[in-house]
Amino acid sequence: MASSIVSSAAVATRSNVAQASMVAPFTGLKSAASFPVTKKNNNVDITSLASNGGRVRCMQVWPPINMKKYETLSYLPDLSDEQLLKEVEYLLKNGWVPCLEFETEHGFVYRENHKSPGYYDGRYWTMWKLPMFGCTDATQVLAEVQEAKKAYPQAWIRIIGFDNVRQVQCISFIAYKPEGY
C-alpha cells in the first residue's frame, strides 16, 4: 500500500510541471466581427479588373460537321506509321498490355438506345484476337494492325493500353480510319 501512495505522488508532481507549459484549451469561436467583410464599392473602375477578353477572339469551337472526334489525339491529323510506333512504344514502356479493337459501323460514340447517352452506345468495340500479354515489341502490334486492316478495310481500328494491375484502360487511340473519315 505504501508503494502505491509514493508512486501516485510522483505522478502528480510530474503532471503539475507539464501543465505549466501547456496551451490553453479551445474556448469556442469568436464573434463574426473580427472576420474581414467584403464591401460593395459602387465606384469600381472596370478597366482595372483582370480580363482575358483579348484572348477570347483566339478560341475556336471544334467544328462538328464532317469532323468527328474519336479517341485520344483525334484532334490531330492521322498518325503516320512512325508516330504509331512511338505511341505503342510509350504504351509498352509504361507496362500496359496492348489490345486492338475494331468497329465496322460507327467509329465514334453514338446514341442508339435512347436520346440521352447510354452506357453501351458506341463505347464497346469488337476485340481483335486476344490482348497481347507479354508483348515487348511495338512492331508486333503494328503488324496486327496491318492484319486487321486487311481483314476489315472499312473498319475503324484502335489500340488500347490496358493496365492489368489496376484493371483499367490507360490509353486509347485510333490507328486506322476507313477512307472518307
Curated annotation (Swiss-Prot):
SUPFAM superfamilies: RuBisCO, small subunit
Additional remark text: The basic functional RuBisCO is composed of a large chain homodimer in a 'head-to-tail' conformation. In form I RuBisCO this homodimer is arranged in a barrel-like tetramer with the small subunits forming a tetrameric 'cap' on each end of the 'barrel'.
Protein name: Ribulose bisphosphate carboxylase small subunit, chloroplastic 6
UniProt subunit comment: Heterohexadecamer of 8 large and 8 small subunits.
Highest taxon of the lineage: Eukaryota
Annotated GO biological process: photorespiration; reductive pentose-phosphate cycle
UniProt KW keywords: Calvin cycle, Carbon dioxide fixation, Chloroplast, Photorespiration, Photosynthesis, Plastid, Transit peptide
Gene name, Swiss-Prot/TrEMBL: RBCS6
Source species: Solanum tuberosum
Chain segment of the transit peptide: 1-57
Cellular-component GO terms for this entry: chloroplast
